[in-house]
Curated annotation (Swiss-Prot):
Active site: 127 (charge relay system), 158 (charge relay system), 240 (charge relay system)
E.C. no: 3.4.21.-
Full protein name: Pro-apoptotic serine protease NMA111
Organism of derivation: Coccidioides immitis (strain RS)
InterPro entries: PDZ-like_dom, PDZ_sf, Peptidase_S1_PA, Peptidase_S1C
Region entry Disordered, spans: 1-44, 1004-1034
GO molecular function (one): serine-type endopeptidase activity
Keyword annotations of the record: Apoptosis, Hydrolase, Nucleus, Protease, Repeat, Serine protease
Top EC category: hydrolase
């Protein structure tokens, strides 16, 4: 089960007693099974290990394979029992389509078994049924498949019930398994019958070793409590969550729930008393009542109870009435403001409930569940003294969230009893279960509690909704919040409310009749207030001996870019850096393209750390890693200064002044010198192509500050800027799966023609040679057939660097294009339009030429060819289709740079967690070539074909991987949670893009939400590891 990552430090430190071993939830998909025990938090004893749920995806299953003991041959009786049992066991494949409560959106698989063949009820784990929106299907033993919907998930205990249509199973008689909780006894031989990651049936044997184990704590996230667990040696493997634990009679005596993930052959099963009661209630058409006094109890052995004050008289009485008992129930957590608050205390030993001597959870549950809305009378011992208390029994369902609201890209609901219990806090407040969009707080996915919005308290979800209804689009408001792991620290942030990319405030309400979550739009966005001009002054640099450095502060602005969807393989949803003002009168700013990668985004510029104005993309350079953006200068009443750019190329060894901004966005200054100017190409990213700079001369300087600063300039003594200092997005490392950023200088002369055109009101429409080159020295050139005459000409033309350029890669043409690429890999370029090419800057002639006459050396022979340049506007993305959670677009420029053949113009750029694309394995970097056997060479033909596919229906996609491997993926369409939508670039639209929503295949234009779309929950890389969307959490 893919959840929040490796377990964090547990809230409470338990003793090493087996009653209370701490647990961790699961292994990450990218982690291997531990070879030695892994200890949670600050525990260092080597005898404790973590525990894992047994529903995982195939990657998890591969990581969690364990060495099993030698298998014994089952008796004939056992074989007959298993043959009967397996007919009722199903493999469940499911998604939680949206983050909710303790779990992020995810796709996984597990096991269940039929408990009512007539009505179509399947029993499985609660963490399979999911607290949030569920979408899934099950596969029977004969490989028949049918949809399943949740009809019950317990608020606390780890079981839930799914429903299927019995009429959908046509080729096998349906049989059900009988639940017999009373047959679970120590020494009973059992079999765990489940699926091994959905691939095949696994049958594991074991023997029950104890019945009175406390429910394991799985760290952060969902954990069962207020029940005992059954322990056995079975070594269940990945995918067996929800498996029936059967005895030799074929009766189910427990439910597989969790186990140790360190290789120890120990598993933990949920007793079936409460699942059996819930099933009987549902079969009778009754509500499953669940009561609580918001108190967690745990089993403690008698020796610990004596230390807590259990009197000898009561111990003797308990041992007399229940001679087999070895412990009693003790209050572990009493939640503030709950029914037990002020009446019970941690450490109270429970003696009686409603006059009945009580030592087991099952009777306590019985009493509470039958007393909802009434009172329960408890007798406890506290420090050796008897104490009688009366508590109101609360409805447990009432404090379990069954709705959430999505607004400004983030998801919220009332704090759940699960989270409140884990952190021993009052069960109230607004909980952020998907911190994204406007509410992306401190790079954490979830866990925030919102105390106030816009200086107004938000004590519950209803108050939160009412406050958000009054906040206009693009408003900046004060947000007060705390993280559930650190409630002592209150955070305050200014958030920018996005109601234009995400205009709808949408309420999702669980519907237990249909098994779906119903969506309601709560309020239309309030239009943004017109911006007003504001005044500000820039900071003064103290102690700087260089006047030019002090003055350049007025030419820098801070740029923040937020992207509503991941395009072009870009790994982040938000970036921040500093830009250089190159025309203060027109509001033109140059910024790294690693900060503003494309124009489907929100850009905000902060001037003088005071004035915030929006900006738009004017120009994206296809090769040299810079973007030109523009803001409205009439809104800025500050002494912004136009930076002066040098028309001369800076030389190696030249002294210069480095002015940059470090990671804290503080300006730093150092006198330095240029150490090297070399032609570079940023390494390509193997996992997923994304924009990178190629064919440019990069400048490096002799100061350690250069590696710490992502933005800045190289400045002459006269205040003229000689080079921009930019960050360049590079490859993702194989080991850490983190993106590499390079910090290099870019000389200013190449910028000046582009800026001049923009200043004159003309957007540059550059044409480029669609190739990547690299430098070769004369020794290599001579071997490859360059004549001595040309070698001499090179030496005269470029005395500083004797080099020529060889074609490393020719960009791939569109499959719909008839263009022929005259250049080939390995060609050495001598001249273009009769000009010898020995510097990267000399390629700039291509920008305004449709064709170039080239003299090249190919296979040792000189030849003349005509090269047609490519218009760069064709290389930028102008359309993105969201289908079944996948982002589809034309192959962007970086794809064409890295691939040798484009298989279609339908390219998978990213996909969302918990979506059909994720569940069925449609991976980023795949090309889709056909739908149901009909070729779809472009997005229009793809839309036509998929629009004809009914909802909840399987269809076939023919795809080709980035490595040219064709394959077929079968997917099921889900329009309820993942309707088809589209972004289309339209300069006349207010945002520069318009949105198209498809309702049952019919186009509806507007600016509506792209439903269930969250850039922070998107994965843009192939399945080789974790992306920046889900960074490693240590």
């Amino acid at each position: 089960m893919e959840l929040n990552g490796s377990p964090q430090k547990p809230k409470r430190k338990h003793s090493g007693d087996p009653h209370s071993l701490p647990s961790a939830k699961h292994l990450r998909p990218d982690s291997a099974a531990p070879s030695s025990p892994r200890i949670s938090g600050d525990q260092t004893s080597g005898d404790l290990a973590v525990y894992g749920y047994r529903n995982v995806d195939s990657a998890d299953a591969a990581a969690m394979q364990m060495k099993l003991p030698a298998v014994q041959t089952d008796s004939a009786e056992w074989q007959e029992t298993i043959e009967t049992v397996v007919k009722s066991v199903v493999s469940i494949h499911f998604c939680q389509t949206a983050s909710f409560d303790t779990d992020l959106s995810m796709s996984s698989q597990a096991t269940g078994f039929v408990v009512d063949a007539k009505r179509g009820y399947i029993l499985t784990n609660r963490h399979v049924v999911c607290a949030g929106p569920f979408w899934g299907y099950c596969i029977f033993d004969n490989h028949e498949e049918c949809d399943v919907t949740p009809i019950y998930r317990d608020p606390v205990h780890d079981f839930g019930i799914l429903k299927f249509d019995p009429k959908a199973i046509k080729y096998m008689p349906l049989t059900e398994l009988k639940l017999q909780p009373e047959s679970a006894r120590v020494g009973v031989e059992i079999r765990v019958v489940g699926n091994d990651a959905g691939e095949k049936l696994s049958i594991l044997s074991g023997v029950i070793s104890r019945l009175d184990r406390n429910a394991p704590e799985y760290g952060e996230g969902y954990s069962d409590f207020n029940t005992n667990y059954i322990q056995a040696a079975a070594a269940a493997s990945g995918g067996s969550s929800g498996s029936p634990v059967v005895n030799i009679d074929g009766h189910v005596i427990a439910l597989q729930a969790g186990g140790r993930a360190d290789g120890a052959a120990t598993d933990y099963f949920l007793p079936l008393d409460r699942p059996l009661r819930a099933l009987q209630c549902i079969q009778k058409g009754e509500l499953v009542s669940r009561g609580t006094i918001q108190t967690q109890w745990i089993i403690k052995p008698f020796d610990e109870c004596r230390r807590l004050g259990l009197s000898p008289e009561w111990e003797a009485e308990v041992r007399r009435v229940a001679p087999k008992e070895t412990g009693m129930l003790v209050a572990e957590i009493v939640l503030p403001e709950g029914p037990g608050d002020g009446k019970l205390q941690e450490g109270d030993v429970l003696i009686k409930a409603n006059g009945e001597l009580l030592t087991q959870f099952v009777r306590l549950d019985d009493i509470l569940d039958s007393s909802v809305g009434g009172d329960v009378h408890l007798l406890v011992q506290r420090g050796g003294e008897d104490l009688e208390v009366t508590c109101k029994v609360q409805d447990l369902h009432a404090i379990t969230p069954s709705r959430y609201v999505t607004v400004a890209g983030a998801t919220f609901h009332d704090l759940s009893y699960q989270q409140a219990r884990l952190y021993a806090i009052a069960c109230k407040g607004v909980y952020v279960c998907e911190a994204a969009g406007s509410f992306k707080l401190e790079s954490t996915f979830s866990g925030w509690i919102i105390d106030s919005v816009d200086k107004r308290p938000t004590r519950n979800l209803d108050e939160f909704i009412e406050v958000l209804k009054t906040i206009p689009d693009r408003a900046r408001i004060v947000l007060s919040y705390r993280h559930i792991r650190d409630l002592h620290t209150r955070g305050t942030s200014i958030v920018h409310i996005d109601r234009h990319w995400h205009p709808h405030m949408r309420l999702a309400q669980r519907n237990d009749q249909t098994g779906l979550w119903d969506f309601t739009d709560l309020a239309d966005p309030i239009p943004a207030e017109p911006p007003v001009p504001r005044k500000a002054d820039f900071i003064q640099l103290d102690g700087v001996s260089h006047p030019a450095a002090a003055d350049i502060v007025r030419s820098f602005v801070r740029v923040s870019c937020t992207m509503p969807v991941k395009l072009d393989g870009f790994p982040q949803a938000r970036k921040t850096g500093f830009g250089l003002v190159v025309d203060a009168e027109k509001g033109l700013v140059v910024i790294s393209r690693a900060i503003v990668p494309f124009d489907l985004c929100d850009i905000n510029i902060t001037v003088a750390d005071s004035i915030i104005v929006s900006a738009k993309v004017v120009f994206l350079h296809p090769l040299q890693n810079y973007t030109i953006i523009q803001y409205d200068p009439s809104l800025v009443q500050a002494p912004v200064k136009t930076a002066r750019l040098s028309p001369e190329y800076i030389k190696q060894g030249a002294e210069t002044l480095f002015v940059g901004f470090n990671q804290n966005f503080r300006i730093v200054v150092a006198k330095t010198a240029v150490t090297d100017i070399t032609t570079v190409a940023i390494p390509p990213n193997a996992a997923a192509p994304r924009y990178r700079a190629i064919n440019l001369d990069a400048i490096t300087v002799d100061t350690g500050l250069s590696s710490q600063c992502t933005s800045g300039v190289l400045l002459g003594e006269d205040g003229v800027i000689q080079a921009l200092w930019l960050n360049y997005l590079g490859e993702r490392t194989q080991s850490s799966h983190k993106d590499v950023e390079y910090h290099l200088g870019l000389a200013t002369p190449s910028l000046i023609p582009v800026i001049s055109q923009i200043q004159s009101g003309v957007i540059p429409r550059l044409r480029i040679l669609d190739m990547e080159t690299y430098v070769i020295q004369m020794s290599q050139a001579r071997v490859m057939g360059v004549s001595e005459e040309w070698i001499e000409k090179v030496a005269k033309a470029n005395a500083a660097r004797h080099e020529l350029f060889m074609v490393r890669k020719v960009d791939c043409a569109s499959p719909l294009s008839a263009d022929v690429r005259p250049l080939e890999e390995g060609d050495i370029i001598l001249t273009l339009n009769d000009k010898l090419i020995t510097r990267v800057s000399e390629f700039d002639m291509m920008y305004d030429q449709e064709t170039l006459d080239a003299l090249i050396v190919r296979n040792g022979e000189e030849m003349k060819i005509k090269i047609k340049t490519v218009p760069t506007e064709d290389l930028e993305t102008d359309r993105a289709l969201i289908f079944c959670g996948a982002v589809l677009q034309k192959p962007h420029h970086a794809v064409r740079q890295q691939i040798s053949k484009l298989h279609s113009e339908v390219y998978v750029s990213a996909r969302s967690r918990g979506s059909p694309a994720y569940q069925y394995g449609l991976s980023p970097t795949n090309f889709i070539t056909a739908v149901n056997g009909v070729k779809t060479p472009d997005l229009d033909s793809f839309i036509r074909e998929v629009s004809n596919i009914p909802n909840n229906t399987y269809f076939r996609l023919r795809a080709v991987t980035f490595d040219n491997v064709p394959w077929v993926v079968t997917m099921k369409k889900n329009d309820h949670y993942f309707p088809m939508s589209e972004y289309i670039k339209e300069p006349s639209a207010p945002l520069g893009w318009r949105t198209v929503n498809y309702d049952r295949g019919k186009e509806r234009r507007g600016t509506g939400d792209i439903a269930n779309l969250n850039a922070d929950a998107m994965d843009e890389g192939r399945d080789e590891g974790v992306s920046d969307v889900e960074p490693d959490i240590e």
